[in-house]
């Protein structure tokens, strides 16, 4: 996900996406431990997407708090 896509979504949608990304990340960790994970680069993509979403959500909270 790119930052423009993330910022265009509502906070509720971002929370849902965040939950799904975290579940996918946990599944990838299990697959890696079992030796079944073929796409290792997906780890960094998921982690970066999670970080972008959390950054956007925290930015929105700070803006609401200061407004």
Swiss-Prot record:
Gene3D superfamilies: 1.10.287.310
CDD domains xrefs: Ribosomal_L29_HIP
Keyword annotations of the record: Ribonucleoprotein, Ribosomal protein
Biological-process GO terms, alphabetical: translation
Gene Ontology cellular component list: ribonucleoprotein complex; ribosome
Family matches, as Pfam families: Ribosomal_L29
Taxonomic superkingdom: Bacteria
Any GO MF annotation of the entry: structural constituent of ribosome
Keyword Phosphoprotein attached: no
Stored HAMAP family: Ribosomal_uL29
Protein family according to the UniProt entry: Belongs to the universal ribosomal protein uL29 family.
Designated name of the protein: Large ribosomal subunit protein uL29
Source organism: Wolbachia sp. subsp. Drosophila simulans (strain wRi)
């Amino acid at each position: 996900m790119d930052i423009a896509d993330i910022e265009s979504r509502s906070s509720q949608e971002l929370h849902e996406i965040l939950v799904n990304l975290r579940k996918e990340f946990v599944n990838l960790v299990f697959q890696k431990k079992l030796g079944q994970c073929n796409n290792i680069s997906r780890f960094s993509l998921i982690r970066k997407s999670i970080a972008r979403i959390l950054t956007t959500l925290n930015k929105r909270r700070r803006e609401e708090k200061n407004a």
